[in-house]
Amino acid sequence: MDISIISDKNNPLLYRREIKFTVSFDAATPSIKDVKMKLVAVLNADKKVLVVDTLDQIFGKLEAEGYAKIYNDEKAMATIETKSVLEKNKIEEEAAEAEVAEE
């Protein structure tokens, strides 16, 4: 999976960076969680404040266009983003921590 950044714009009014990107892949369209983790690595961002808003498949190509936001802090993200978008981007950290605690 390769990610290329189309635009990276700072939006100080909403305390965030807005990123438009394309994702190239070999098989099925990657999940939002997979794209989010790849963006965290590419942009060197904190996964707690990065939100993948949209990920749209381009018809007939093994590519998808996406829109992500990186907030300055979690408080701004919780105030501005809708609950559905936050749930869609939630990473199951609690489940991973529970597995470690059981061992």
Swiss-Prot record:
One of its GO terms (biological process) is translation. InterPro entries: Nucleotide-bd_a/b_plait_sf, Ribosomal_eS24, Ribosomal_eS24_CS, Ribosomal_uL23/eL15/eS24_sf. Keywords: Ribonucleoprotein, Ribosomal protein. GO terms for cellular component: ribonucleoprotein complex; ribosome. PROSITE patterns: RIBOSOMAL_S24E (PS00529). The keyword Ribonucleoprotein applies. HAMAP family: Ribosomal_eS24. Belongs to the eukaryotic ribosomal protein eS24 family. This is Small ribosomal subunit protein eS24. It comes from Methanococcus maripaludis (strain C6 / ATCC BAA-1332).
